[in-house]
Amino acid sequence: MGDFFNVDNKFFQGLGKIIDVICLSAFWFFLCIPIVTAGAATTALYYTVNKVIRNNRSYIGREFWHAFKTNFRQSTIVWLILLLLYAIMGFDCYVMYQYAKAGVALGKIYIVFAVLMMFATMWAIYLFPYIARFENQTKMILKNAALIALGNLWKTLLLFVLLLAAAFAVYIF
């Protein structure tokens, strides 16, 4: 019974990690409100989870802010590229879907744009963790994240399905 009240026991360590994850989620959420900073916030989230939560080092606020500032420029560039791709493909998908609803045969090409958006999302799954983990040029980050996504296609598909399930759960609740 004396070990139960010890702050270093497994229960309190686990509780501390849960609180850290909640705080990190709040940091990430508030820094994603201005859409431009979402890439840097996501990179900082991955960096902090890896360094503080997994490896039990340092403090979450300090590490999150350090990673946010350090990776801000590169993450923002990658995020804006990704947003531009999503905007173009989303617009094309919407227009072609409207053509398909109107009975135009070429409108069925919206499926191609939807699949391209799916691949862009699977690529994005690896972009920000890659930036958080490695220092590289932006062009190499984009290339290597794509190679990782394609090289681990089944795991990437599983991550994509989990991401869709999480998005659906947030939408429902």
State where each predicted segment sits.
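Conserved, surface-exposed functional patches that form binding/active-site neighborhoods
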Residues: 116
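Helix-coil boundary and N-terminal low-complexity module in membrane systems
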Residues: 1-113, 121-173
